[in-house]
């Protein structure tokens, strides 16, 4: 494993960490029981099978 040769300052560490951004989940349209909904792609199959209750949202 790589070991840093010298200590990294707190400001350098935090600015390096701040470059990371979470990606937005892409929503896909799905029609369940005649109603159109948008769900993330990973939940598409569950939505089609009726495992997600859309009335709570």
Swiss-Prot record:
One of its GO terms (biological process) is translation. This is Large ribosomal subunit protein bL32. Keywords: Ribonucleoprotein, Ribosomal protein. One of its GO terms (molecular function) is structural constituent of ribosome. NCBIfam families: rpmF_bact. Signal peptide: none annotated. It comes from the Bacteria. Pfam families: Ribosomal_L32p. Belongs to the bacterial ribosomal protein bL32 family. The lineage of its organism: Bacteria, Bacillati, Actinomycetota, Actinomycetes, Mycobacteriales. Residues 1-19 have a biased composition (Basic residues). Residues 1-22 are annotated as: Disordered. GO terms for cellular component: large ribosomal subunit.
């Amino acid at each position: 494993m790589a070991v840093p040769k010298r200590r990294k300052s707190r400001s350098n560490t935090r600015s390096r960490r701040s470059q990371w951004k979470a990606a937005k989940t892409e929503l896909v349209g799905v029609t369940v029981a005649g109603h159109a909904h948008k769900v993330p792609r990973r939940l598409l199959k569950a939505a089609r099978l009726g495992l997600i209750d859309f009335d709570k949202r």
